[in-house]
UniProtKB/Swiss-Prot annotation:
<dbReference type="GO" id="GO:0005789">
    <property type="term" value="C:endoplasmic reticulum membrane"/>
</dbReference>
<keyword id="KW-0812">Transmembrane</keyword>
<feature type="domain" description="C2 3">
    <location>
        <begin position="385"/>
        <end position="522"/>
    </location>
</feature>
<feature type="transmembrane region" description="Helical">
    <location>
        <begin position="764"/>
        <end position="784"/>
    </location>
</feature>
<keyword id="KW-0256">Endoplasmic reticulum</keyword>
<dbReference type="InterPro" id="IPR047257">
    <property type="entry name" value="C2B_MCTP_PRT_plant"/>
</dbReference>
<dbReference type="GO" id="GO:0009908">
    <property type="term" value="P:flower development"/>
</dbReference>
<keyword id="KW-1133">Transmembrane helix</keyword>
<feature type="transmembrane region" description="Helical">
    <location>
        <begin position="625"/>
        <end position="645"/>
    </location>
</feature>
<dbReference type="Pfam" id="PF00168">
    <property type="entry name" value="C2"/>
</dbReference>
<protein>
    <recommendedName>
        <fullName>FT-interacting protein 1</fullName>
    </recommendedName>
</protein>
<comment type="function">
    <text>Involved in the export of the long day-specific flower-promoting signal (florigen) RFT1 from the phloem companion cells to sieve elements. Promotes flowering under long days through the transport of RFT1 from the leaves to the shoot apical meristem (SAM).</text>
</comment>
<feature type="transmembrane region" description="Helical">
    <location>
        <begin position="657"/>
        <end position="677"/>
    </location>
</feature>
<comment type="similarity">
    <text>Belongs to the MCTP family.</text>
</comment>
<dbReference type="InterPro" id="IPR013583">
    <property type="entry name" value="MCTP_C"/>
</dbReference>
<dbReference type="GO" id="GO:0009911">
    <property type="term" value="P:positive regulation of flower development"/>
</dbReference>
<dbReference type="InterPro" id="IPR047258">
    <property type="entry name" value="C2C_MCTP_PRT_plant"/>
</dbReference>
Amino acid sequence: MTMTGGHHHDAHHEDFQLKDTNPLLGEQWPKGAAGPARPAVGGGIAGWLGLEKPSSTYDLVEQMFFLYVRVVKAKDLPPNPITGSPMDPYVEVKLGNYKGTTKHYDRRANPEWDQVFAFSKSRVQSNVLEVYLKDKEMLGRDDYVGRVVFDLAEVPTRVPPDSPLAPQWYRLEERRVGGGGDGGGLKVRGELMLAVWIGTQADEAFPEAWHSDAATVRGEGVASVRSKAYVSPKLWYLRVNVIEAQDVQPQARGRAPEVFVKAQVGNQILKTSVVAAPTLNPRWNEDLVFVVAEPFEEQLLLTVEDRVTPRKDDLLGRAALPLALFEKRLDHRPFVQSRWFDLEKFGIGGAIEGETRRELRFASRVHVRACLEGAYHVMDESTMYISDTRPTARQLWKPPVGVLEVGILGAAGLQPMKNRDGRGTTDAYCVAKYGQKWVRTRTMLGTFSPTWNEQYTWEVFDPCTVITIGVFDNNHLGNGNGNGNNAGGGGGGSPPARDARVGKIRIRLSTLETDRVYTHAYPLIVLQPSGVKKMGELRLAVRFTCLSLMNMVHLYTQPLLPRMHYLHPFTVTQLDALRYQAMGIVAARLGRAEPPLRREVVEYMLDVESHMWSMRRSKANFFRAVSLFSGAAAAARWFADVCHWKNVATTALVHVLLLILVWYPELILPTVFLYMFMIGLWNYRRRPRHPPHMDTKMSWAEAVHPDELDEEFDTFPTSRQQDVVYMRYDRLRSVAGRIQTVVGDMATQGERLQSLLGWRDPRATCLFVVFCLVAAVVLYVTPFRVVALVAGLYLLRHPRFRSRLPAVPSNFFRRLPSRADSML
């Protein structure tokens, strides 16, 4: 949507602001509190909150209570009464209207499940828990075998760090005639090992449990709704220094080969320059750098090729080298030993056997120096939002300086992301990424105000880093198809479903005060082809705890990245290419986890498209620069007013200050630093109280033109109509022309400065040289204080003594030549 509406603009912008929240954090165990289904007198589920418990480490989330049921195994089950063979048992756990079932086993008398069910207290409408054992193959009749009944008022409470509750054996009983729910039926053959307790989301069983909130999810979708933690693969830079090759034999005799080496690791391909080899021993001495991940599954494939024509390359030999062959370098000093590798022949030589094949195989070889660089930090995210700066090798890591704790409380006001059963809905989950650790909350189904209340912790090795938290809509809920309940799925020929972006936020740790809990609702803002849109709010509780203040302060004096990035830096082009290769590896590895963290999620969190051209971003960056220099411009205007005596009192005070500084020059630097100290103290009262958040106004998202938005969302290469592309190209040429003019003017001024002593204009240079000689003599015989005083008084002279024409130095400088005259 385009930002219009006049007086509604301020209210609309206010909707994008950060909001304070006051959640009730930490564990709450009020004595004698009742659940929603507590009877009027005794019984019921009052026992859920009838005990006072000590607080645990989950103090940044609102306490949530669950009834946990662990179904471990069964024994001594009766056979099928019809066939006489062992039954196909499964267990059904029923609490009110909620039912959860284990998988069934074929013909098993002593099955083992070890499955946990979790029922949310807020949705329980019963005071009795029933656990049924059933036979799946008893068709056409009641498959009921036996049950175990629990009164919720008698269920014990358990919260970490308490030890896990030990499961017990329970005899199965018959269902009482009349449907009574309080147990007491006749005992039947068979026993179930169960553990039933009241716990919170801090329980160890919480992440892997079946949740009543996701009772409608079946099959493969069950795994995709659970909370999970992931670890990024350990990435290394593989540096391959291709030195030379020996005895390279071209396939076509009588010509000097033009040889290059192509190196490939996985889908990464790099080539050396093409070198003419009249002596058949070409030399390159070029570095090729790749990104590889542990465990090293790929090989380094080196191929030597001959550039016959611009479109034809002949393969002369190859060598396949396992990555484990190369040593790991942890510093810039150790010398890596180079090695010769034999090249295996291709073409005709590849089909020859015996001695001839061995001769061909060892006829050519390549000289390589390769190592795995462990002293670099492998970039897999945008450098502006980096979350980790540690080198690859663990031996080089410093101790952590702090701990970051994030409580993901919930969201509010989410927008419908798809249609299900004829109405809009959202199945939201959160992903948080900091350092090598990724976390994913459970999916809350069919709600626009999901409540997660999950807390996660990260070690902090550098406070000048950023945590990224994103919200996504889960489109992989199973139900027998690949796209779950995604409304855009379509037929069988539709592309695979993708988890839709709801929005994300970033928090820079250095902007947080230590040991303070920040509880805010962050706006989830996304830019769509129709304009900027608020997708809801994400409620977080964040705390940054300092472990060592001295180490943290010391970090501010250290380089942001490891030493190798400065001793042996990569080029900007190399870093960009390596970053995208690292992103691809991380996305591929996390996509192979179970449940997978999907590629579209990883790419959105890592800002894979942050380099793409955007007129909106260009405008935003331009106005950021304008805002940056606005203070200097204001100071220049104030000084011009002082020089022109706009305010006589101010000009008089400046004269007094000039006299003091001229006669006491030793006060200049102390005055400057004391002034900055006082400004810092004055600004302390107005220091930012909240973490920064997405600013739609600064991002130029509220006033962006619809066509510029459409261009930003265009594919690469473009997929728009030809006339639209022509129009955008002309617009880009217009913008680039203005930039070209500004850059040319800057170059002209610099070249005029160079020409002062360059004798390109002999008269101007002669005048300047004579002026320098006179100035040297005058400044030598005149005290510095007198010179400074005269210069200051001349600069502050009254307008009566000023001319409206440009000054003599300006006239002289503008007449100097530049190289603009030599441009075509």
